A protein has these predicted regions:
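Exposed, low-structure sequence patches enriched in small/polar residues
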Residues: 221, 313, 318-574
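Active-site-adjacent bridging/hinge elements
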Residues: 49, 236-243, 381, 537
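Bacterial Sec-dependent N-terminal signal peptides
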Residues: 1-37
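An exposure/low-complexity boundary signal
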Residues: 31-32, 239-244, 522-524
Length: 574
């Protein structure tokens, strides 16, 4: 049944958020201290940082690696501390990576190696990482071009696939107290065949917001991410803007991933002693008006996600975190409670107190750097749970949970820069779903957690090798079993966008139920860094999907080559 929209509440929330933000910005000069913008999310970049923490054999006091992105200042401080104490940068490749991290955030390292030997036309690229830069006591500015030009062949398409992205990245500081970041990119792309096929069922471009059709089978979309950043005190950092968040130490996240599009957020992070506490409020799209021809005109219905995560370092090797997240309706005044805006409270208690029907997820995560070169990690997400129903073994539909376990093994068999990661993910049917678009765990019709949604098992293996300082080789693969719906009216619990009140049965639900879909995905990539942050990539992708549903019974091979400049690799790994 369609809910009557009452935008008063959404306007009220926006009103108070704006007043809070204006107050903070107006007041910050009274107490703000030096701060730092983030290093953009990039699995290759972040792997180096995680690698050195594992190699050191103890947790990084400067970083709580479960919360991503990391701040540039913290990255440099941690890298410098390792260079002085642990000698973890022992190989040529590790020493290159250390210098890369310092050069990429030279405003914090002041590394002599960040200077270009021959600036372009005297004024450009005085620093290896920046086209233009301003380095004054009251103003710091970094401007870099962004390019992603890729061309490939998909075995199921006659025409080539490609990506053509042009953009700019800007970051800086004002008075060393307030930071700012902006990324803008214009894209035209012909997507892989299996991604194009998915648009028929869910007409949104993975990772993106508004899009339109380009030529016969392409897509055109604009990317924009931006935020302001400042430290309220030495230990409290705040950010406001539009970007992504990743929670976890795995390749996937079952809590908060970077798969969905960026969203408007207000974030407060407290890091003190051995404790890190994050509160974040996100505004996301509950649904969109889209067809295979592109996104329709808004405005779209809005919902909010209030999220907090607390973690503590126990000893020098073990980190334990607890989280709670509530998805609530911003277009109805019937069941919103302003207590959701309280950054230090248990949302489940609010539900019990006021009888709320909002969707609350709770759970835990951990990381254990057991010995040098070996780390274990995991996540547990509880969407709904009744112990007696679990004990009965009757497959009650509302026993909704997700589990992740993994390990990272650094310098495998004593071979420098050969790293292995293994991971398993299990998600029960109907997890992340709700009886309303305003309660499911999604943004712009895309999962906020795992890209496969729910009702699946998955195994992942990743091997990374850096035989030469500028050469990175990655072999990545996953095998997943997911239960699909036989038709649009059926609901086996794998599509988190479907109303879970339309479930096929209250009992007898098992992981992978419905029409079974087996996916084998292999990605072999070699990347060579020609200049700082300028890469040439060669890639081979093999994807085999077996199902009784013809649309999902496909075999795809893709070969491609790309030039990347100041941007992470783009993937459709599902």
């Amino acid at each position: 049944m369609e809910r009557k929209k009452t935008p008063r509440l959404a306007n009220l929330i926006n009103h108070y958020m704006k007043r809070l933000i204006v107050f903070i910005i107006a007041a910050f000069p009274l107490f703000a201290v030096a701060q730092s913008t983030n290093a953009p999310l990039n699995e290759d970049y972040y792997h180096w940082i995680d690698r050195y923490e594992i190699k050191a054999g103890r947790l990084a006091p400067e970083l709580f690696t479960t919360i991503k992105p990391y701040q540039r200042k913290a990255i440099v401080a941690y890298a410098d501390s390792l260079q002085k104490k642990d000698q973890v940068f022992s190989s040529r490749s590790d020493q290159f990576n250390y210098e890369y991290l310092r050069n990429d955030s030279w405003e914090w390292s002041r590394a002599a190696t960040s200077n270009s030997e021959k600036p372009f036309l005297k004024y450009f690229y005085k620093k290896k990482s920046d086209l233009l830069r301003v380095d004054e006591p009251e103003f710091d500015l970094h401007v870099s071009p962004v390019l992603y030009a890729g061309l490939g062949k998909d075995s199921n398409l006659n025409d080539p696939i490609y990506i053509n992205l042009r953009g700019v990245e800007i970051r800086g500081m004002i008075d060393k107290k307030i930071g700012f970041y902006t990324f803008l990119g214009e894209n035209q792309s012909i997507l892989p065949s299996y991604v194009q096929n998915g648009l028929a069922d869910n007409p949104v471009v993975p990772h993106e917001l508004f899009w339109k059709k380009f030529k016969d089978n392409g897509v055109d979309f604009f990317q924009a991410r931006a935020y302001i950043d400042f430290n309220v005190t030495k230990h409290i950092n705040m950010q406001f803007g539009q970007d992504r968040t990743f929670i976890g130490n795995g390749y996937r996240s079952l809590i908060f991933s970077d798969f969905a599009p960026p969203s408007l957020f207000l974030r407060a992070n407290v890091k003190i002693w051995k404790i890190n506490y994050l509160f974040q409020l996100n505004r996301v799209a509950a649904d969109v008006n889209a067809t295979t021809g592109g996104s329709g005109q808004g405005p779209y219905p809005i919902k909010y996600i209030a999220f907090h995560h607390a973690s503590i370092n126990i000893g020098k090797k073990f980190n334990l975190g607890l989280f709670e997240s509530v998805v609530f309706d911003a277009d109805s005044s019937s069941h919103f409670d302003a207590s959701y805006l309280n950054p230090v409270i248990f949302y489940r208690a609010i539900e019990q107190q006021f009888g709320s029907t909002d969707n609350v997820l709770v759970g835990a995560d951990f990381k254990w750097n057991a010995v040098k070169r070996l780390s274990f990690y995991g996540q547990f997400v509880l969407d709904e749970f009744v112990l007696d129903q679990i004990k009965s073994g009757d497959g009650w539909w509302a026993n909704k949970f997700a589990v992740q376990g993994g390990l990272k093994y650094i310098d495998v068999a004593g071979i420098d820069n050969l790293d292995l990661q293994l991971e398993a993910n299990v998600v029960r049917p109907f997890t992340y779903s709700h009886n309303s678009d305003y309660g499911n765990y999604s943004n712009y019709r895309q999962p906020m957690a795992h890209p496969l949604g729910a009702n699946f098992n998955e195994l992942i293996a990743i091997v990374r090798y850096q035989p030469l300082p500028r050469l990175n080789m990655v072999a990545k693969g996953f095998y997943a079993k997911k239960g699909l719906d036989a038709g649009v009216t059926e609901n086996q619990g794998g599509d988190i966008l479907k109303n879970n009140s339309t479930r096929i049965s209250d009992y007898g639900n098992t992981i992978g139920q419905g029409v079974q879909n087996k996916i084998m995905y292999i990605d072999l990539t070699a990347s060579y860094m020609l200049k700082h942050n300028f890469f040439i990539d060669g890639k081979l992708i093999l994807r085999d999907s077996k199902s009784d549903l013809p649309a999902y019974n496909t075999n795809t091979s893709i070969t491609s080559i790309a030039l990347r400049w100041n941007i992470a690799q783009r993937g459709y790994e599902f």
